[in-house]
C-alpha cells in the first residue's frame, strides 16, 4: 500500500501465484492498525485496479466506510447490463481520482530499482521482506530529507 508521496505504507508478502484481491482487506487492517498513520477509515481513499473489483470486496469496503475508486471489470459490466434494471446501478467511479493511482505504480517502480527486490535472489521470504522494508525505509528517509 502506497501513499500520495510514493512511499510504501504497508507491505504484505505472498506467494507468486496468490491473488491480490484476498490480501486487500488484511493489508488495509494492517495499515489502519499501524502506528505509522493516525487516519481513520473515513479519511482513507483506496485506489485499486480491476483485480480488486470483486463484489464482496466492494461490499466490505462500503461496510467499513472506506472510500474507494476501483473500475469495474468488463464481465461485471456485461452481467449488470444483462439483468436490466434489476442489475442495479454501476458503482461510482471518478476518472480524475483514478488517475492518481499512478503514484502506486511509481512507488513499486522506485522499489524495483533495488536489485535485490527486482530480481528476488533471496531464498527465504523473511530475507526478501527484510530487503523490501530496508529499501522502503531508505526511500522514505531520502524523501523526508529533501523536504
What are these regions (language model features)?
Residues 1-75, 135-136, 147:
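Polybasic low-complexity intrinsically disordered regions
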Residues 36-121:
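Helix-centered, glycine/charged polyanion-binding patches within enzymatic domains
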Residues 126-147:
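C-terminal domain-tail junction helix/linker
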Residues 17, 124-127:
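Aromatic-acidic/polar surface patches that form glycan- and anion
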Residues 14, 46, 107, 128-129:
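Short glycine/serine/threonine-biased micro-segments
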Residues 31, 35, 115, 141-142:
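Short amphipathic alpha-helical segments enriched in hydrophobics
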Residues 20, 24, 100, 130:
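Hydrophobic (often cysteine-bearing) scaffold residues that line and stabilize catalytic clefts
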Residues 30-31, 80, 130-131:
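Juxtamembrane/interface motifs at transmembrane-helix termini
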